[in-house]
UniProtKB/Swiss-Prot annotation:
Keywords: Glycoprotein, Host Golgi apparatus, Host membrane, Host-virus interaction, Membrane, Transmembrane, Transmembrane helix, Viral envelope protein, Viral immunoevasion, Viral matrix protein, Virion. The gene is M. GO terms for molecular function: structural constituent of virion. It is a multi-pass membrane protein. PROSITE patterns: COV_M. The chain crosses the membrane at residues 26-46, 57-77, 86-106. Residues 2-25, 78-85 are virion surface. This is Membrane protein.
Length: 228
């Protein structure tokens, strides 16, 4: 009987020549992908296009699992022990931060009941009750004042369009901004009519507490907030 010797396995090494060849082969596709992501991140705002903003949120959300997969890949195919150590640290940090994101998002969802709570860009959700409907929209910063603008029936809150068919009399007395740890209440301090169908209102932060939004409440009822 003749003994068979197993063929040696090919060991792939990532060298400078391999990297250059990879870029030459995939340069065009990578350029298109990066250009698409750059345009989405640059122009993805709720005040411009809600569709582009949602696409932006999907891209940002996919960054975490993609980062974790790449870190695990680096752990499996580490060049040496130094790279392995850094890869393990980066993997742990990525997983911990992703878990923290889900924990904070679930806490915010419990407070507001809105799927915008899983927005990876911000943990500030503006909530306004107009005609019995609670509109929830993400805002980037913690503002001291909020502005509602009505232009011939088109209602905008901080530049974000909420809908049509509204008047200044439909604006509530209070607006809230939900955060992970607390809820900020804004009281209407100023209302001015530009003409018969247009105008604006300014809301000023008046109270901060650990509340959640009830499922149904009268328009502008500050006392309807539920403590948690």
């Amino acid at each position: 009987m003749s003994s068979t010797t197993p063929a040696p396995q090919t060991v792939y090494q990532w060298t400078a020549d391999v990297a250059v060849r990879f870029l030459k082969e995939w340069n065009f596709l990578l350029g298109i992908i990066l250009l698409f992501i750059t345009i989405i991140l640059q122009f993805g705002y709720t005040s411009r296009s809600m569709f582009i903003y949602v696409v932006k949120m999907i891209i940002l959300w996919l960054m975490w699992p993609l980062t974790i997969v790449l870190c695990i890949f680096n752990c499996v195919y580490a060049l040496n022990n130094v790279y392995l150590g850094f890869s393990i640290v980066f993997t742990i940090v990525s997983i911990v931060m992703w878990i923290m994101y889900f924990v904070n998002s679930i806490r915010l969802f419990i407070r507001t009941g809105s799927w915008w709570s899983f927005n990876p860009e911000t943990n500030n959700l503006m909530c306004i009750d107009v005609k019995g409907t609670v509109y929830v929209r993400p805002i980037i910063e913690d503002y001291h004042t909020l502005t509602a603008t009505n232009v011939r029936g088109h209602l905008y809150m901080q530049g974000v369009k909420l809908g049509t068919g509204f008047s200044l009399s439909d604006l509530p007395a209070y607006v809230t901004v939900a955060k992970v740890s607390h809820l900020c209440t804004y009281k209407r301090a100023f209302l001015d009519k530009v003409d018969g169908v247009s105008g604006f209102a300014v809301y000023v932060k008046s109270k901060v507490g650990n509340y959640r939004l009830p499922s149904n409440k009268p328009s502008g009822a500050d006392t309807a907030l539920l403590r948690i």
